């Protein structure tokens, strides 16, 4: 950019463009802006009388040229003089054009440089138009005042994240994207940056600039028009863990790279700048917690046509290409793997190796393990030889040892000491690099990685077929059973993708033959026994918290392709819980479930698999067969008693298949839950299941839209004489007041229904109909849930009348309704009556105040049936609790459970609560979580807990809300009293039976 552009003459020229009134407003804005920016003030008297030329001189005199221009540009923006802003931009683009030319040259060179796989040679370096449009949309300002965007590109290794970023940089340098959005776009690779000594952001920018002296001041003058592209974020060790006090806001200050990038991401430095961050699938918790993420974009890799193009380019011979492609296309799993370009290269390389040896490709395509074993064993078999040499055998064994260590220590980059410890000598390294299975990594000469994490996983699995974990030089390497448990439990080792599958896949008969041929031995029988024992333990332990990922188990068993063992293994499981999100999941689940005969509980979801059917599309025959295998477990597993289907979309044909299995005489379900399920077809088919299922006792619909006709059909089915449903939940099902008429008929006519939950539906004016039905002496309902049903205080009159006349309802939940003190007063009139039989009342978040507690206190004394009272999330405060405590200490009060969470309580009320603890003979559970109690209040409560007459068994407090002294006090009290539990999760504690 020409130096004269920053002169006072250039500034004067722009000021001349302002009309008289605009020039006056410019001066007013100047006064305000310099105050906001805390800049040295130009005397207002001088500004006020200055001409355009004089004001330009004043600006240059009091502020440096660059700063003067930045202030002027900001004022132009405030005045909405976009034309002047654009003129400035055009004149400033000298630097931008210089940098764009450099970026284009740099990234074109990187694109053309030789890679291991050379995948890029088969595809154009230019970004497709649809990709350009999508990238532009990602960074389009969404709201005024919220310009900066932080976008995450998330995907597995090899999916093409770095490729996309390189294409983005080239497209930006050609003005194909972000043309009016970003003046400068800088690419930082964390893998390279982590090797740098402490540096500054200015230095990092200068590294990317074509000349030694980058115009930093100019570059950052409009930070809202800066984009920082950060690749391989997971390589940033210790990133985002720094306390706020360690962050840096100075562009010129030298700090460790992770601190600089953390300062950028957490908006301490250049908060107006936008960020594009590429990361592997497991998004670190600190990134989610510390960074405001605008959007997450997941690259799709190769689509089907890309895969076909790649096969044709790779094999050269069209006939061979189509032979390989068609075989892979027949396997959902292999075809899915080809979505990731690097894995597609591995698969094609493996097939090409087998072709050249005249092998049957169908055998190689039997499983993922077969592809990888062929790939790896061929790399370690010298060209023209029948088998490996002792040296290549040793090299592969050493590599397997290294891989196992890496998987257990979460290490994916290795130094030479790591290699030596596992038996890789220096002389082996060139040969291993020559196989391409091991690569040099980053800038350091002595740093190595496996070609892909899946190759590392395969080698780690292979280790267990060659040696015992006890023979490994690193103590972190554990036994097979621990590996399997870690693989099957959702919360552990989330980054293990294929490790368990490769381990079981290597037990396949054909794979054992390969192992015998290559190594002369293998340990398959011992491992099979360990897998059996592991699944037996999991089956006996159960899965109460949903910790075990049944799909992970299914994938491992599917990979074995051993029906006899699979049948034996799946029947060790009593529960299955899994999510089907693609066709591969569907195939794998179907394969295993068709052998199940011992399941007691099944919970699953199906998403993105079954599309809506019409004359143009239908569910494929193969998908329907797989779906039938999944549904058939309802009839083949004689012990299955509970089915939960959630977060699912079913097409008409799959819905019909499911309903047919549900109504089969061999289906003996007792509990059926349908949560957030949408289905095409006649819903009456589902309700008619009740005609055929006399064992069904519990039926639940949640977040599933039911029409008026649906409700009518459902209630007709529930009234079927042979039906035995006792519990019905229709939560958040879009019910309306009109539906209450049909439900009222159900309550009147059905003599088996004891539980009804219609929470989260807008029922309001329909509640009187329900209450009228419940006034009938013939109703048998015990539990009634009306939480968040948009009830008002007027509804309380009908509910009160019902409580007086009904002799069966024991549990009533009216939470999350605007009842207020007036509604509570009406309810309490009924509660005080001797004819009221209610045992449990939930009034959480009902907008009750301390004033309402007086009526509630009176009811507690009068009603000796009431055992449970939940009034959390109401601002009753210390005054309200004081009123309740007077009732709780009364000899006629029989309350056993009291919920006072988040009621605005302080330690002031602890003395009153303490008196309840020492006087009440019945109170067993008291929830005080989410209140602002301090140490003094807790001391008072603990003194009461030590009283010999105290009957409390559960005290609801979150220990971590208190200081160390108070936490120690609460822990000591728990240890002193073995019958006392102090927890912040009172819902998990067993309730008193009604």
From Swiss-Prot:
Record's protein name: NACHT, LRR and PYD domains-containing protein 4
Any one Gene Ontology BP term: regulation of inflammatory response
PROSITE patterns in the cross-refs: DAPIN, NACHT
Free-text function comment from the UniProt entry: May be involved in inflammation and recognition of cytosolic pathogen-associated molecular patterns (PAMPs) not intercepted by membrane-bound receptors. Acts as a negative regulator of the type I interferon signaling pathway by serving as an adapter to promote DTX4-mediated ubiquitination of activated TBK1, and its subsequent degradation. Suppresses NF-kappaB induction by the cytokines TNFA and IL1B, suggesting that it operates at a point of convergence in these two cytokine signaling pathways.
Binding-site list for ATP: 155-162
Domain free text: The pyrin domain is sufficient for suppression of NF-kappaB activity, it adopts a typical death domain fold, but in contrast to several NLRP family pyrin domains it doesn't bind homotypically to the ASC adapter, which supports the observation that NLRP4 has no effect on IL1B activation.
Similarity comment text for this entry: Belongs to the NLRP family.
Gene Ontology molecular functions: ATP binding; molecular adaptor activity
The keyword tRNA-binding appears for this protein: no
